[in-house]
Amino acid sequence: MTEILITTPFITLQQALKLSNIVQSGGMVKLYIKNEEILVNGLRTTQRGKKLYPGDELIIKDQKIVITTKANEN
């Protein structure tokens, strides 16, 4: 499992994919989302601008990514 720590209220799917090193650039995101199944909280999404909030979970190619904030760390 990978965690993405954010300090803002939300992050977009595009930003999350870049921060987790799944894609290298914003231009690659559109193609990646079109060609790969991405689940956000169990639902397939194709919206690169989808807002992700702390506690949201992404599943991409059997890799789990969780959005967190400092408040969620124990």
Question: What are the functions of these language-model segments?
Answer:
Residues Q47-N74:
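C-terminal structural segments of small proteins and small subunits
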